[in-house]
């Protein structure tokens, strides 16, 4: 049998062999069992005659076993640095299992004590064949604990290889290692949990060897790998769409804080100390000091990292540039829209210089990078923001105005909206949009063509842009119908003003306010249909005075 064992041993195993306790060895030191690691790992083994030999007195030599008898040594102990192949390890393990099952003395006693769950692992670390059967682990529990564990039917007492039950080992045959082809989630989870329970004594021997032979990540056997987190950088969060979850102007405006239709808070109302009559429409603007805390935090965070973004934006990909543009524009609009909600420029949560620097960088991204867009698309984006903000201004005035008679009169309502816009919003927006004015002048080749609908040689400007948006979003919806009358828009508008004077008490002050409004809007150069309507309205209001 010994000859047979030596013949079947792998060529790379060196002096490693499995010792059969029933064969007497001649002039040989206790054989070292097949080693797997240089680490000292405790092993809990049960021998059939352990109870008998534990009762006998032990010699001093038995009380202090030498490390050479324990059976732990490096897999490179022979100095050849040759690793054992997986096939040779499995073959030797299978041979040891067959030899162990062939001896009735060991097999019968082990099966009686362990209720049929004994595997070849129980005799892996045995003593020599002279009958001096020693206990091979100096780190194991007491005799009583081992006996109780054996009799309790626990399936963990013989798991010195993978921590699984002997039934699982017998079903898996000689497959010691769980590879991608034969791994089982349940068995590997059991192995991991068992190995963890004995972590205070040492790591599993075969698990360590498997990690060396088959490198793997510990969590691969449990489930899918989690996405590796992006290495943080000062500005990396601005390159991902999840940051801030920027929204389009329509979305963030109608979901932001402010006195809207359903807010139950009056933003624009008459001053209680002033007589509320239609001819005296002095407004008392109620301040709403609360800024959205999230928007303010995002703005300050962006301003803090703005120098790094400016220094590194040329190395960003096209996708990263698009995401960065969206985040910057979303944060900028969420702050500037407050100017249409009864805020002044000095009440914004950042200095006007910082807000302008942020907009300058945004203009650079949209005009001079790989993610640049056409001038018409860029202007349409700006106009969309201004137009939607003007709708907010109109809604706040119309639905929060105290005098319903004044609001229900179209001429007076337009006059109130114009006053608030031209006396307050217009100049504040000129300040925060100043970087656009600089870009219109410095980069005229980019902005010149296609600004107005008709062919034009006029370069765009911020004041024209604001007035144009006010014309299209506020004025034309009220008075566009006068263009289709038989007598012409100017004549029809004049008759309409006279009727409003008689029915709704339109005063000279109201007409002068409209004269200022239409006169300033008429300064927009061009010959578009919308501009022709403004010219007709201006002529009609002049004739009515």
Curated annotation (Swiss-Prot):
Q: Could you tell me the superkingdom of the organism this chain comes from? A: Eukaryota
Q: Give the residue range of the signal peptide.
A: none
Instruction: Identify the Pfam families for this entry.
Output: HbrB
- InterPro entries hit by this protein: Bit61/PRR5
**Which stretches does the entry tag as region Disordered?**
1-24, 78-166
Q: Where is the composition biased (Polar residues)?
A: 11-24, 106-130, 151-166
Q: Which Cys-Cys disulphide bridges does the record give? A: none
Q: Mind listing the GO biological process terms from this record?
A: TORC2 signaling
Q: Listed GO cellular component terms?
A: TORC2 complex
Question: How does this protein assemble?
Answer: Interacts with the target of rapamycin complex 2 (TORC2) subunit TSC11 and the TORC2 effectors SLM1 and SLM2.
What protein is this chain from?
Probable target of rapamycin complex 2 subunit BIT2
């Amino acid at each position: 049998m010994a000859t047979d064992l030596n013949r079947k041993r792998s060529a790379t195993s060196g002096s490693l062999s499995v010792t059969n306790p029933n064969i007497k060895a001649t002039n040989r030191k206790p054989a070292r069992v097949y080693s797997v690691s240089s680490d000292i790992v405790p092993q809990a083994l049960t021998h059939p005659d352990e109870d008998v030999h534990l009762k006998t007195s032990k010699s001093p030599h038995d009380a202090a076993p030498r490390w050479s008898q324990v059976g732990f040594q490096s897999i490179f102990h022979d100095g050849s640095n040759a690793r054992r192949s997986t096939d040779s390890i499995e073959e030797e393990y299978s041979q040891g299992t067959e030899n162990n099952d062939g001896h009735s003395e060991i097999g019968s006693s082990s099966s009686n004590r362990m209720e049929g769950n004994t595997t070849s692992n129980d005799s892996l670390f045995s003593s020599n064949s002279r009958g001096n059967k020693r206990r091979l682990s100096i780190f194991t529990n007491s005799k009583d604990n081992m006996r109780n564990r054996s009799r309790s039917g626990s399936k963990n007492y013989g798991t010195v290889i993978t921590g699984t039950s002997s039934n699982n080992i017998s079903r898996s045959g000689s497959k010691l290692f769980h590879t991608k082809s034969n791994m089982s989630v349940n068995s590997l989870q059991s192995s991991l949990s068992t190995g963890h329970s004995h972590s205070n004594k040492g790591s599993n021997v075969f698990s360590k060897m498997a990690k060396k032979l088959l490198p793997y990540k510990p969590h691969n056997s449990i489930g899918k790998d989690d996405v590796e987190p992006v290495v943080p950088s000062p500005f990396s969060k601005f390159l991902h769409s999840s940051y801030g979850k920027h929204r389009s102007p329509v979305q963030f405006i109608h979901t932001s804080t402010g006195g809207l239709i359903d807010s139950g808070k009056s933003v624009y109302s008459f001053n209680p100390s002033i007589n509320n009559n239609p001819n005296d429409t002095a407004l008392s603007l109620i301040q709403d000091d609360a800024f959205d805390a999230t928007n303010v935090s995002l703005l300050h965070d962006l301003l803090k990292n703005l120098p790094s973004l400016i220094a590194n934006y040329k190395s960003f990909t096209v996708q990263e540039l698009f995401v960065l543009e969206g985040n910057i524009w979303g944060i900028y609009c969420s702050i500037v829209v407050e100017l249409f909600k009864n805020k002044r420029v000095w009440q914004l949560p950042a200095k006007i210089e910082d807000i302008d620097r942020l907009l300058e960088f945004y203009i650079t991204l949209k005009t001079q990078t790989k993610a640049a867009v056409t001038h018409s698309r860029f202007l349409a984006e700006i106009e969309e923001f201004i137009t939607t903000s003007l709708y907010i201004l109109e809604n706040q005035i119309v639905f929060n105005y105290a005098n319903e008679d004044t609001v229900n009169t179209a001429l007076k309502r337009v006059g109130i909206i114009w006053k608030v816009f031209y006396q307050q919003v217009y100049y504040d927006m000129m300040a925060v949009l100043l970087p656009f004015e600089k870009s219109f002048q410095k980069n005229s080749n980019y902005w010149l063509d296609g600004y107005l609908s008709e062919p034009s040689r006029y370069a765009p400007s911020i004041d024209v842009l604001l007035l144009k948006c006010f014309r299209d979003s506020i004025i034309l919806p009220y008075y566009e119908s006068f263009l289709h009358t038989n007598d012409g828009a100017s004549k029809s508008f004049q008759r309409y003003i006279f009727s409003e004077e008689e029915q709704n008490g339109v005063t000279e002050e109201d007409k002068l306010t409209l004269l200022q409004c239409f006169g300033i809007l008429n300064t927009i150069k061009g010959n578009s249909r919308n501009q022709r309507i403004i010219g007709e309205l201006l002529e009609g209001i002049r004739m009515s005075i």
